[in-house]
Amino acid sequence: MADTPTFGRYAEIPYDQMTPEQQDAYRSLIETRGRLPGPNKIYVHNPKLAKVMGPLGAHFRTGYSLSEREREIAVNIILAKWGSAYPTNAHERAGKAAGLPVDKVEAILAGLPTSFTDTREQIIYEMATCLANARWVPKGIFDRAVAALGHVGITDVITLMGFYTSVAMTLAFYDVPADAPGMAR
């Protein structure tokens, strides 16, 4: 392992210095993403974890119950709560690229109230804000979420927020800055 940090405080492991298990996890993540972004660089250190986190992250990229706009509402709410620079910067851009209005993304990241005209987007905003702030959801919001999203959508939002909580905490612990390039692969 390199002694000099290459990704915030984290010193990435050159591929030829990885254990066989780490190399296997690395290849698995590359196959899933085509690259090794963000916390995946760190997860390689723990091959068993990497083999769980990679597929979970992949679930939230294609073929699940949320639109990209809906995803970015929930992700930006939880990332704003944690304040980790690297993923917050990436998902501020992703939210805007998904078509969320700039003022809505900026309000979410600043912790300011906002609203959405789309029913699903609004209930995702409400439930995610409740979960991130109060860590409890009132019955009325629960009922509206069930009606708008169903339990599949609700569990996608909740698990997505948990996944990005882990991402934010990992990158905050290693103090990864917003513009961290990491080691060339």
What are these regions (language model features)?
Residues 1-185:
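Hydrophobic alpha-helical segments
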